[in-house]
């Protein structure tokens, strides 16, 4: 990736360092010493959280647009910044803010990629690596914050506001402050360029308010052009009825559960049956692979190669279909080792304990009592039904042969699916 152009230097004849007998303007006093720049400042404006729901992005989304980055570099984390203010009635909590940092930079520079930590949300693009980023962090005395922009089709979490957008006074004051910072950085020239760590996400230029206002549009256009040239579309696919039907027609073990095609629709109800899964709480059943915890869950799943190479398989003939062809079931078992040295070890145990057999704690729907034609509630007690003539029971309808769910009662219990590998 090309290095961004250096900032343009603006100098004046009366403040050139090479001129002799240089005199200062104004009050004639020496400037106040400035502290060292904060090396944990994000390149982008933050997200303000106005609700209780935590920050979460679907897989492959959540990385701000960067005109100078490649797909492999688009990975990092959002870090929550809790705020509070002292009032006359005590301490008042303010709305939290979230800031984005590239992998290996910022306050959590030493945190391994996708490690679990409170207040940290990892995001990455498809094809991104876990290598430390070359973009570093921002020097606020030199560079103004970039208004955070996302790829088209990105689902912004509900009750989150992108700072620097909209017409409120907060964003207006921030924009004017950015303009002043940019003007100061331009007048300082090359002396301030060494304060920013790493490579900038954007090409530098004269820090005017017009250039800052046009920057988000420029980033969006450059990203769309790159997507068109590579033949990729970043917009998430909208699940239609036709798509849902096609997903349902896939083989059961090849389906993928999402929010639009949840776990129950894809794989059936959770339960103890031989063809039922016993993993998943209410949130996982609802969101599937779009659950914010999915990256940690997926680390427990074996790859296709590991599954075929580590499992004990058994082929069982169950029955025949309508044409007389035999129906077989492939059962498998195995185990994996959870390494205590892994940084996600405690998170794995927490996920397993909260999701294994979680269906046993699901609330049961109460059946409403049936009412008669005159509006009276029918009672099921034997004393009230003595005078009612017993109706002959109907013969149960014949079931269609070949249905997996209808034959589950006759199947032998399958062993739990676990896998054995040395981490």
From Swiss-Prot:
Keywords: ADP-ribosylation, Host Golgi apparatus, Phosphoprotein, Ribonucleoprotein, RNA-binding, Transcription, Transcription regulation, Viral nucleoprotein, Virion
Chain sites annotated for binding RNA: 83, 97, 138
Sequence segments annotated as region (Disordered): 1-41, 159-207, 230-252, 363-407
Modified residues (Phosphothreonine): 405
MF GO annotations: RNA binding
Modification note: ADP-ribosylated. The ADP-ribosylation is retained in the virion during infection. Phosphorylated on serine and threonine residues.
Biased composition (Low complexity): 13-25, 168-200
Keyword Cytoplasm: no
GO cellular component: host cell endoplasmic reticulum-Golgi intermediate compartment; host cell Golgi apparatus; ribonucleoprotein complex; viral nucleocapsid
InterPro entries: N_prot_C_CoV (IPR044344), N_prot_N_CoV (IPR044345), NCAP_bCoV (IPR043505), Nucleocap_CoV (IPR001218), Nucleocapsid_C (IPR037179), Nucleocapsid_N (IPR037195)
Domain CoV N NTD: from-to ranges: 39-164
Positions of region (Dimerization): 251-360
Domain of life: Viruses
Localization (cell): Virion; Host endoplasmic reticulum-Golgi intermediate compartment; Host Golgi apparatus
One Pfam short name: CoV_nucleocap
Quaternary state and interactors: Homooligomer. Both monomeric and oligomeric forms interact with RNA. Interacts with protein M. Interacts with NSP3; this interaction serves to tether the genome to the newly translated replicase-transcriptase complex at a very early stage of infection.
Family the UniProt entry places it in: Belongs to the betacoronavirus nucleocapsid protein family.
Name by which UniProt lists this protein: Nucleoprotein
Source organism per UniProt: Bat coronavirus HKU4
The encoding gene: N
